[in-house]
Amino acid sequence: MSRIGKKPVAIPSGVTINVAAGNQVEVKSTKATLNKTFSSDVTFNIEDGVVTVTPKNNSKNAIAQSGTARAILNNMVEGVSKGFERKLKIIGVGYRAKAQGSELNLTLGFSHPVVYKLPQGITAETPAPTEIILKGADKEVLGKVASEIREYRKPEPYKGKGVRYEDEYVAKKEAKKK
């Protein structure tokens, strides 16, 4: 069995988990609510403040799905209790960002400003014009949003200009010599 799938998921106080028919799982807290439909190869057992994910049979797929379901459920619980955060840095002359409500205005060297509409449940802050902090309860959606913003202007390898994750290292290349 999957080593990750064997570990139980602790339910913090203030978080409730409901498992409906068809493996529809709802994780609720005062901050956020997340819903996800899991594979029919796994079962969820809630008892004594912990959730255990077990495969329905010993097939390779069911065992793999149990580990995946446990990891996703753990991220859902952590997301509704603490939340997730992703930081992006903008490097380049004249490159900047500004958060305005549910939109993010990006100036990235194009002939037009890029207006990125944030999905529901994701908020953006710009403490500095070259810094973006994305926050949300759903780790998957947060990563997708960060990836889409980075996709507008990926860091180039010569000067490092572009949008990058805060912890990202960009390998620099040397310019051609005549």
UniProtKB/Swiss-Prot annotation:
An example molecular function term from Gene Ontology annotations? structural constituent of ribosome
User: Which one GO biological process term can you cite for this protein?
Assistant: cytoplasmic translation
What is the name listed in the Swiss-Prot or TrEMBL entry for this protein?
A: Large ribosomal subunit protein uL6
- Stored Gene3D superfamilies: Ribosomal protein L6, alpha-beta domain (3.90.930.12)
Q: Which PANTHER family match?
A: 60S/50S RIBOSOMAL PROTEIN L6/L9 (PTHR11655), LARGE RIBOSOMAL SUBUNIT PROTEIN UL6M (PTHR11655:SF14)
The gene designation is: rplF
Protein's job: This protein binds to the 23S rRNA, and is important in its secondary structure. It is located near the subunit interface in the base of the L7/L12 stalk, and near the tRNA binding site of the peptidyltransferase center.
Provide this UniProt record's keywords sorted from A to Z.
Ribonucleoprotein, Ribosomal protein, RNA-binding, rRNA-binding
Q: Which NCBIfam families does this entry report, sorted A to Z?
A: L6_bact
Q: Which domain of life does this protein belong to? A: Bacteria
Offer a single GO CC term for the protein. cytosolic large ribosomal subunit
Q: How does it assemble?
A: Part of the 50S ribosomal subunit.
TM region positions = none
Q: What is the lineage of its organism?
A: Bacteria, Pseudomonadati, Pseudomonadota, Gammaproteobacteria, Thiotrichales
SS bonds (residue pairs): none
Family recorded in the similarity comment: Belongs to the universal ribosomal protein uL6 family.
